[in-house]
């Protein structure tokens, strides 16, 4: 059940409460000073029973508990901080945090309603060894996909050698001939990537999905950390949590490095579909943190295969465009002619080598879910390495012999549209009714290329506040990687998404999911500070609705946000 996001009245006796109250053992410490240790211990046991008494481990890996009553070492300080807090007080603090998010405009659209971004108070924690594995696996994956894109829009060696079938490229709606032969500066097409991971029943990380077009969600990583450092300030110092506030500087450095050659001081802009887009807050936040201009399509003009930005002081040249809209809407001269949110001629300027588009046009061929099934082979082919992170076991209905096997076992598999986003169109066979299974069977039979099938994975669970108790909820992890051409840097932590409804495996916010702050523990002390936003332009004060420029939902919002 989704938590009630209304802000309740303060508990009796409370006169005020800060937006991000520190979780502290106040009542317990007072009792200790009076010497009433027995009362304190009983209060601890009572609070522990109230919050975790109904916590039953599911048939999945639990992030906090190794087994009933046995806490994993990394979580011991967090559990100690939660124990003395009354459940009603914990709920009150969570609602106060939601109210603070609303005041800052950190919201999202769900079922046509604007809601505060749901952040759970229990963090997801990864120790240094776990994170080393994750970041090596994510960086390896990005390098392999980068090599694939260069090959697919160049010599096509992997296709000639039979590693990947030609039909995968030629039948892809994301293959753009305009991008063929275009050599981006530094050879980088994937400047930003979001690689979705899950932890299976054995506790091993597996890759669930690659996002290398317009990966979204990093602003929530930043905002989650800003909130949690105010809730658990002492824990951050005690736990040596690696900070996340270096992302904007890393991204800006990568974008500047991607500028066309011969530009001494490149001008970078963030191109947004506009305030009606569901992730407009993220676009504005990143532009502000990087100290660059946030622009819409009508703010740019192309002339002589160059891009200019209209300003009150006249037109200024633009060298790098970090674009947050889909290929189809980017340039009406090359793609959809009815697009009113793009910039006519910008693709021609990119093809002429006078502006860099980040991420590159045509990257969709690399995060096609059917291509996902070939990535382990691509890692071996291009990098001569074994995959650090395995895939989820997958099947390709478009291959001879696999279609009938998938159709026969459809009630035991997870069926996904290869071009789906935001959890849309996913059918979980073991939980689907007969009518849904039959409809899905016919859809797969009619278009085998449009689907993949996967073995169900019992996503790991994490204690999550449900009402006034903790309950196990399924989670995934989206680490964000930045590629500057010489190194692939992975933001420590990433976005942990949580399915707030009991038993649900769909974690996407567009499907009612929430989030957790992801703590990566350093081996030694990690400097902590909350970065204040700076740079040109205020953040939006009112959260935008997920509507298009004409007041209706448009495809670009799905493509830009649901990744």
Task: Identify the function of each model-found stretch.
Residues 1, 8, 17, 27-29, ...:
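Preference for protein termini
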Residues 13, 35-38:
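Residue-identity detector for glycine
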Residues 18-21, 34:
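Compositionally biased, low-complexity intrinsically disordered regions
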């Amino acid at each position: 059940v989704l938590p009630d996001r209304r802000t309740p009245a303060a508990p009796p006796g409370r006169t005020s409460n800060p937006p991000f109250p520190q979780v502290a053992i106040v009542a317990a410490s007072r009792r200790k000073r009076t010497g009433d240790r027995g009362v304190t211990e009983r209060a601890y046991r009572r609070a522990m029973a109230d919050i975790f008494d109904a916590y039953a481990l599911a048939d999945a890996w639990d992030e906090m508990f190794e087994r009933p009553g046995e806490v994993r070492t990394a979580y011991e300080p967090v559990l100690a901080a939660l124990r003395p807090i009354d459940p009603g007080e914990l709920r009150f603090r969570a609602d106060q945090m939601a109210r603070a998010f609303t005041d800052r405009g950190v919201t999202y659209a769900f079922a046509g309603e604007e809601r505060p971004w749901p952040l759970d108070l229990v963090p997801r924690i990864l120790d240094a060894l776990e994170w080393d594995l994750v970041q090596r696996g994510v960086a390896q994956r990005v390098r392999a996909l980068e090599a694939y894109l260069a090959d697919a829009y160049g010599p096509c060696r992997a296709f000639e050698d039979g590693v990947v079938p030609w039909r995968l490229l030629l039948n892809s709606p994301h293959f753009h001939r305009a991008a063929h032969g275009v050599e981006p500066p530094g050879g980088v097409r994937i400047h930003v990537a979001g690689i979705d991971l899950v932890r299976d029943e054995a506790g091993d990380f597996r890759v669930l999905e690659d996002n290398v077009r317009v990966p979204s969600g990093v602003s929530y990583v930043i905002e989650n950390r800003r909130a949690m450092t105010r809730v658990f300030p002492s824990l951050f110092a005690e736990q040596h949590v690696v900070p996340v506030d270096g992302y904007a500087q890393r991204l800006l450095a990568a974008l500047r490095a991607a500028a066309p050659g011969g530009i001494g001081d490149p001008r970078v802009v963030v191109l947004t579909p506009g305030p009606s887009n569901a992730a407009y807050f993220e676009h504005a936040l990143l532009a502000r943190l990087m100290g660059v201009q946030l622009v819409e399509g009508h703010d740019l003009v192309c002339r002589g295969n160059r891009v200019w930005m209209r300003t009150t002081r006249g037109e200024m040249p633009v060298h790098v465009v970090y674009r947050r809209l889909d290929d189809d809407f980017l340039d009406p001269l090359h793609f959809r002619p009815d697009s009113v949110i793009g910039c006519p001629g910008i693709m021609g300027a990119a093809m002429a080598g006078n502006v860099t588009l980040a991420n590159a046009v045509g990257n969709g061929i690399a995060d096609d879910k059917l291509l996902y099934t070939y990535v382990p082979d691509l890692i071996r082919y291009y990098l001569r390495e074994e995959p650090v992170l395995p895939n989820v076991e997958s099947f390709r209905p478009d291959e001879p012999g696999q279609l009938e096997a998938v159709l026969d076992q459809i009630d035991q598999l997870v069926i996904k549209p290869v071009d789906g986003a935001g959890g849309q169109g996913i059918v979980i066979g073991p939980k689907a009714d007969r009518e849904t299974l039959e409809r899905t069977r016919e859809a797969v039979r009619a278009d085998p290329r449009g689907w993949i099938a996967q073995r169900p994975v019992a996503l790991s669970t994490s204690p999550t506040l449900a009402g006034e108790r903790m309950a196990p909820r399924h989670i995934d992890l989206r680490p964000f990687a930045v590629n500057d051409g010489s190194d692939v840097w992975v933001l420590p932590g990433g976005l942990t998404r949580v399915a707030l409804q009991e038993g649900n495996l769909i974690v996407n916010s567009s499907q009612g999911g929430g989030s957790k702050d992801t703590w990566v523990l350093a081996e030694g002390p990690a400097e902590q500070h909350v970065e204040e936003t700076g740079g040109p332009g205020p953040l939006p004060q009112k959260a935008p609705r997920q509507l298009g420029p004409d007041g209706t939902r448009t495809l670009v919002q799905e493509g830009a946000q649901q990744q």
